[in-house]
């Protein structure tokens, strides 16, 4: 118990950053404005607000002027909420909505500052080389390739519903000392009517944020998960026979872009004070690995089913006693890796078992040795991607391409750019699939949807439109995968583009999940 308390004392000092004055700095709103316009490949921000870039900048300047007025924060948010239900003019509705969005985004940027500074100093202290590569989502998969083939069981964990808002603010007080800023946080959480969109529904494996307060609620959710994972880090380190450096490296990555291992959990100390030392022997396993993204987590182990069951109920008890809410045990599923495929980060992952027979000759005797090898395999779930395209109105549920009417008012170059960017992003994100044939079906759907959208705009048929402008018009914006790979790999390498559809490539520059993958 003393060791746990000493572990917590290392990080007992609070953050001394006073954040509230930053709300009156113009550059904060400029950062929020840039983030809002560039946050989605679907240009959701521009479509939601109904403004172009120029008029949005004008609104930002108007907001900065109003922010100095008395009770401006309260009036702006209340106006935005009331205008949803009360008849107001079109301009007033979008103005209030835009102001509320900008304040929310700016507030989120400010509250992330102490955590970002802490993360940078942490990696400098640890002297972690190339830690920026750990920001990539794809960096998780080489880790799984190396580890999962030697493990037996995997637990699929759905992180439970978010806790009460006041508990989140109280936890945040351990990090931020600025009292006015914390009061403003309470105001945001209690006033926004779209708080329910932040909840994780039982039917979905990922959490859903409202379009208007996405960054704020993402920050709150990340902080909540950060709190959940702290005790797991501590117990895992104390119970491990082998102090592997890779464990710290890969578990630290998920605090916004990395996970920091220190946090105060004083409430839980009282609960586990009597049983803490007796608990450690339950979890002793040198081959246990944990990865998480969004509302899912995977805990894999070489141990027995009994060990995984004990970890399962440990998580349930921790959520119950520390966060004061009950988590159903059915949210954690234990499966044997050899007979199980799991969906994670847009890939359908499994262990392939390959058996090979080798004839061995010793003097006059010969015998056959059967060798069984396991390989971590990742493929693209084409059906789920088609479902995402259907939700985004690019095709029907059966995969038949349709036009995108909402984009028909854009210029031809903008339409081509949007479709081409989505297609290239999908190929880039799913470059780690061992079977890429399904991606070419997705590419066909997007290309034909683009052609139908252009034909709809010009009041023509697809065949007539392509005959008049030529099919090469679409080829220019849908870069073939082989062309991209030829730029990445020099000609002197043994990498053959002919077999590129079977090669798995992981990129270290992907720091956010693709929007279409996020919809599935």
Swiss-Prot record:
GO CC term (a single one): chloroplast
Location in or out of the cell: Plastid, Chloroplast
Entry function: Usually encoded in the trnK tRNA gene intron. Probably assists in splicing its own and other chloroplast group II introns.
Keyword Ligase: no
InterPro entries listed in its UniProt record: Domain_X, Maturase_MatK, Maturase_MatK_N
Stated name of the protein: Maturase K
Source taxonomy: Eukaryota, Viridiplantae, Streptophyta, Embryophyta, Tracheophyta
Keywords, ordered alphabetically: Chloroplast, mRNA processing, Plastid, RNA-binding, tRNA processing
């Amino acid at each position: 118990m003393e060791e746990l308390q000493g572990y917590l004392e290392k990080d007992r000092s609070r953050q001394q950053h006073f954040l509230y004055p930053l709300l009156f700095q113009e550059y904060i709103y400029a950062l929020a404005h840039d983030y809002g316009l560039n946050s989605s490949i679907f240009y959701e921000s521009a479509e939601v607000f109904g403004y172009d870039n120029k008029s949005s900048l004008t609104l930002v300047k108007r907001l900065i002027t109003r922010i100095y007025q008395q009770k401006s924060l309260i009036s702006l948010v209340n106006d935005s909420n009331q205008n949803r239900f009360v008849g107001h003019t079109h301009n007033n509705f979008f103005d209030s909505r835009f102001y509320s969005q900008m304040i929310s985004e700016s507030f989120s940027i400010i509250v992330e500052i102490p955590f970002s500074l802490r993360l940078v100093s942490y990696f400098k202290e640890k002297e972690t080389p190339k830690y920026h590569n750990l920001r990539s989502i794809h960096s998780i998969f080489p880790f799984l390739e190396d580890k999962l083939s030697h493990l037996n069981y995997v637990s699929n964990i759905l992180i439970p519903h978010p806790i009460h808002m006041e508990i989140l603010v109280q936890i945040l007080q351990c990090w931020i000392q600025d009292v006015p800023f914390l009061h403003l946080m309470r105001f945001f959480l209690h006033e926004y009517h779209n708080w329910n969109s932040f909840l994780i529904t039982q039917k979905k494996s990922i959490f859903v944020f409202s379009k208007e307060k996405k960054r704020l609620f993402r920050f709150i959710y990340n902080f909540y998960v950060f709190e959940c994972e702290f005790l797991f880090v501590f117990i895992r380190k104390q119970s491990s026979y082998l102090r592997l450096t890779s464990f710290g490296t890969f578990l630290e990555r998920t605090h916004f872009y990395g996970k920091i291992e220190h946090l105060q959990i004083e409430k839980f100390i009282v609960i586990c004070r009597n049983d803490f030392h007796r608990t450690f022997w339950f979890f002793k396993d040198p081959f246990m690995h944990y990865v998480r993204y969004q509302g899912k987590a995977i805990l894999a182990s070489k141990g027995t089913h009994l060990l995984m069951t004990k970890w399962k109920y440990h998580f349930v008890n921790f959520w119950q006693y520390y966060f004061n809410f009950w988590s159903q045990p059915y949210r954690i599923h234990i499966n044997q890796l050899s007979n199980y495929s799991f969906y994670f980060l847009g890939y359908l992952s499994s262990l392939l078992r390959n058996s090979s027979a080798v004839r061995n000759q010793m003097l006059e005797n010969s015998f056959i040795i059967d060798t069984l090898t396991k390989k971590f395999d990742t493929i693209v779930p084409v059906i789920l991607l088609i479902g995402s395209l259907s939700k985004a109105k690019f095709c029907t549920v059966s995969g038949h391409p349709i036009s995108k009417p909402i984009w028909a008012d854009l210029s031809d170059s903008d339409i081509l750019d949007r479709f081409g960017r989505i297609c290239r992003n999908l190929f880039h994100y799913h470059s780690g699939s061992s079977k890429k044939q399904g991606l070419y079906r997705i590419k066909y759907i997007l290309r034909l949807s683009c052609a139908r959208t252009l034909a709809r705009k010009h009041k023509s048929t697809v065949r007539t439109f392509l005959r008049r402008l030529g099919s090469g018009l679409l080829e220019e914006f849908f870069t073939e995968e082989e062309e991209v790979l030829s730029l990445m790999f020099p000609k002197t390498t043994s990498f053959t583009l002919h077999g590129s559809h079977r090669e798995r490539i992981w990129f270290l520059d992907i720091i956010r999940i693709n929007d279409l993958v996020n919809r599935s």
